[in-house]
Regions:
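Active-site acidic short loop of glycosyltransferases
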Residues: 11, 82-85
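Hydrophobic beta-strand segments of well-ordered beta-sheets in folded domains
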Residues: 14-16, 38-42, 63, 116-122
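N-proximal low-complexity "stem/linker" segments adjacent to membrane-targeting elements
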Residues: 1-32
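Short beta->alpha connector loops
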Residues: 21-25, 47, 71
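Active-site acidic Asp-centered loop
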Residues: 45, 83, 90-92
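Solvent-exposed polar/charged
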Residues: 8, 35, 56, 80-81
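Catalytic-site signature of metal-activated, phosphate-bearing donor transferases
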Residues: 1-3, 72-79, 87, 94-154
């Protein structure tokens, strides 16, 4: 209860990794997520090149973009580029509305005692059916590491 009440005071910095397989939706998705997260990275699996408009937008906003052949490659690789405490992975076509934002903060509050540990990463999967969310937090300190899994059906 106390940790939950104080959660806003210790809100960690959060990176959003947008998994992009739809260039047409990319800029609007980034604009939406930039309001919520401290850092945005694009993991691009779209084969076609970005338009000049998208390239200009990414450069102007200092958004890093990395190219992948498939989604399976993304998670472990992208974490080396993350500068924040927690990392959230979102599909580019999903709607991250207020309801989902509240869910995300509720998940964070469950792990509030882990926030000060070292090497925290956090993944939040927003799946296509918009009903099922899987959260996975990993933290390690010294030689000890723990895995925390949360599954939410909404």
């Amino acid at each position: 209860r106390i940790a939950r009440n104080n959660f806003q005071l210790i809100k960690p910095k959060v990176t959003c990794v947008i998994i992009n397989d739809n260039n047409d939706q990319l800029i609007s998705s980034i604009k939406k997520e930039m309001k919520i997260f401290d850092e945005t990275i694009v993991a691009n699996i779209q084969k076609e090149s970005f338009t000049n408009k998208i390239n200009h937008f990414l450069n102007k906003n200092d958004i890093q973009c990395y190219q992948y052949d498939n989604k399976q490659e993304i998670q472990n690789d992208i974490l080396q580029y993350v500068h924040c405490s927690w990392c959230v992975f979102l599909e580019v076509n999903e709607n991250f509305d207020k309801k989902n934002k509240d869910i995300l903060y509720n998940i964070f509050s469950l792990f509030s005692e882990a926030i000060e540990k070292e090497n925290i990463t956090f993944t939040f999967y927003n799946l296509k059916n918009n009903e099922y969310y899987h959260a996975h937090a990993i933290y390690s300190q010294y030689n000890h590491s723990s895995n925390i899994n949360v599954e939410l059906n909404i």
